[in-house]
């Protein structure tokens, strides 16, 4: 008979936040509630699931975007959850990661409200046209209430913020004000259709907000239900296409090229090509690794809406488009900090240079 219709919804979702808003705690809570991890770590105990880089663990901040995989509604929705760097000085990687997202979850600390860094992230999401959900965290601590925070969001970031934790009548009234199509249905006295709400979110007319406390696991289930209910997969091209968004190294020093598939299918051992006209590269995709935290499984093929780390591609650069996918433009966020390297006494300069080259490869400015 005909091939079975693949009804799995595959999404790449990135979590972005101001540095102390509880982003890693939310990621942990999400993975815990989705069943990916059995116990909760805490950033302050330095065993958080997504922060696998030793440099990060020592400093308690997230530098390299990590990812975790989980499923919702009985496997019908598969999510690659990318933790984007929260420090603006790691902005080129954050920007490239945002460029491969289907949806973003922006985490805001309720007591702190909208920070100037929140506005920077919002501008980045707007420029990349990423539909965005908000999780307003730390609502268990003293601070402004929901209405005051929604007012602040609208004042500082613009229209479209709707409390999805409100009762349906209040939510629908707020939704109608954000989108003409929803307004027409609302004025006609019709219940708002899920599909129309999904479309309004995809068009960035509506930004659903949930309020809660990641640490207390409050509001996390509602966010996950929202990710399953109010999303749709990106249209996928028929021919193979993928976007490289970062390059890193595994523990053994093997080069990993991270890409998001946008069309067709990527099969293990496929030959990929890229680089500028006339000076291009061609290489075999040795392994297709699906990472969740520090662990990975090997895939035979990777489909649109999935992210994988490929070994064997020595020359692929972050931002590069493969197959039918075109290259991303240059990152627009200028790094805020410049760095000077001071080597401790007795350091072998050659080893240090090799390590600096590795960092330069991973962050091609």
Per-segment meaning from a language model:
Residues 2-21, 39-40, 110-251, 271-272, ...:
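P-loop NTPase catalytic nucleotide-binding module
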Residues 5-6, 36-45, 50-65, 90, ...:
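Active-site phosphate-binding and catalytic loops of NTP-dependent enzymes
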Residues 20, 26, 60, 81-83, ...:
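Residue-level signature of catalytic and energy-coupling elements of molecular machines
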Residues 160-167, 171-176, 323-338, 342:
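Short, exposed interaction patches on small structured surface elements
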Residues 230-232, 237-339, 353:
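Conserved nucleotide-binding/hydrolysis modules and their immediate coupling elements
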């Amino acid at each position: 008979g005909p091939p079975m219709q693949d009804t799995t919804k595959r999404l790449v979702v990135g979590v972005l936040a101001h540095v102390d808003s509880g982003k890693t705690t939310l990621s942990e809570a999400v993975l815990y509630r989705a069943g990916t991890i059995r116990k909760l770590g805490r950033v302050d105990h330095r065993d958080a699931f997504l922060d696998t880089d030793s440099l990060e663990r020592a400093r308690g901040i997230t530098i390299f975007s990590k990812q975790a995989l989980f499923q919702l509604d009985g496997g019908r929705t598969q999510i690659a959850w990318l933790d984007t760097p929260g420090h603006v000085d790691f902005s080129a990687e954050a920007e490239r990661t945002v460029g491969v997202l289907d949806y973003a979850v922006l985490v805001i600390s309720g007591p702190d409200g909208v920070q100037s860094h929140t506005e920077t992230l919002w501008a980045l999401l707007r420029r990349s046209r990423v539909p965005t959900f908000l999780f307003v965290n730390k609502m268990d601590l003293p601070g402004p209430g929901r209405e005051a925070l929604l007012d602040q969001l609208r004042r500082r970031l613009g229209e479209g913020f709707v409390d999805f934790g409100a009762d349906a009548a209040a939510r629908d009234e707020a939704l109608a004000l954000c989108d003409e199509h929803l307004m027409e249905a609302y004025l006609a006295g019709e219940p708002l259709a899920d599909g129309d709400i999904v479309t309004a979110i995809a068009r960035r007319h509506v930004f659903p907000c949930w309020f809660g406390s990641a640490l207390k696991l409050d509001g996390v289930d509602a966010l996950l239900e929202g990710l399953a209910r109010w999303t749709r997969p990106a249209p996928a091209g028929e021919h193979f296409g993928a976007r490289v968004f970062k390059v890193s190294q595994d523990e053994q020093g093997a080069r990993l090229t991270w890409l998001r598939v946008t069309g067709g299918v990527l099969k293990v051992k496929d030959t990929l090509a890229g680089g500028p006209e006339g000076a291009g590269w061609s290489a075999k995709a040795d392994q297709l690794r699906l990472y969740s935290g520090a662990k990975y499984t090997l895939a035979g093929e990777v489909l649109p809406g999935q992210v994988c780390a490929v070994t064997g591609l020595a020359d692929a650069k972050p931002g590069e488009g493969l197959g039918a996918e075109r290259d991303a433009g240059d990152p627009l966020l200028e790094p805020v900090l410049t760095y000077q390297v001071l080597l401790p006494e007795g350091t072998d300069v050659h080893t240090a240079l090799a390590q600096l080259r590795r960092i330069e490869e991973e962050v091609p400015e």
